[in-house]
Amino acid sequence: MTSSDWANPYGVRKPYGSNGPANGFPDADARATFSADHPLVPWKQPDHMDQWVDVDHSGEQLKRFLARWPTLDELLDGGSGDGRVVIVSGLPGMGKTSLIHRCIHEARQRVAKGASEAGDPLAVCVPTAGLMNDGHRISVGPDGSFAPVELINTRIRKEIAKRLLRHAFPEERVRSIVAEEDPYQAYGDMRDLLDQHNALLFAVIPHIRWNDAGLRTDFLRSCLSAAHPRIVLFVEVSHGAAETAREEVAATLHGSAAVTHLALRELDAEDIWRFSHSARAANGGPGGLVEPDRSSLVAAHSEWRPSDVRELRRVFHSAADALRSAPHPWPIDADALRPHWERRRAGRASLLRDPIPPRSGG
């Protein structure tokens, strides 16, 4: 870890290093590390809330999530017949994973508020592809090819099983759930186990680059069938310019009261300015930086046209790093950002001229 990484106010603290130690608890001897490209995970790293900003319509979608979130009684009610599926869709790099983690943070808080009246249910959170939500972890086979759907579903259950075992659920019951060939039966057995231990499951399912649109539709439907009472699945769906996941999700799961669809869209003119406030606080101020220049950053949108939230964070991180050596405090404005976005733009142009061959599989 370099001193610039340590000091950079736009770096995101990695929860317990990266995806956490094996036991799921912080290591008192571990040194904090920061990244220019890590999702915000406030349910695991509370100070990530300080870096949450409403970019790419995420605030609007968070309000939608909270408005549709069921009561704790409804989540626990085995007679309701339904669990819940929350689908977050949008272009790559737009902050879908951060929005999912923020939704889980809010859901855990709501569960905690009503916990005493419900016997203090345990909320078990399982990012099945790690906190970065990297679908390759579960969608690529041992030989590097795309894994069969059955293997993907089994891997998801194995990740859930690991977390249940850490919470001292009966090993024999957990192993039988993984071994069950019928996914619907497996999640039904999981529901029974959660009910017996007064627990809830919040599982995060990553975006998977399906080789066939029909497989993706079938997988989304299987997620809905897997969402039994006490089980909430948060499913990430990325899409490119050639397709609209919003329409696909609506057509696939139309009319189900158990589904909440959150759709992120393109950045607007205010998002550069909004993102400038995602700096970590330090010594009572935003990491030693001068208050960002609003008019300059709003005007920069038409010149820069950032492609996604990931690009915003990397450019701000790079600019803040460069400003550390300035002889006096310097505002994050268009002039400070321009050299860094121009470098990225040149890199994109180079890739368009000489594209990298696509990877096989997920």
Residue map of PLM features:
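Hydrophobic residues on the short alpha-helix immediately C-terminal to a glycine-rich phosphate/catalytic loop
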Residues: 103-107
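Walker A/P-loop nucleotide-binding motif
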Residues: 80-102
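Mid-core helix/loop region of P-loop NTP-binding domains shared across ATPases and GTPases
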Residues: 151-228, 288-303, 312
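The catalytic "switch" region of P-loop NTPases
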Residues: 92, 135-140, 199, 211-304
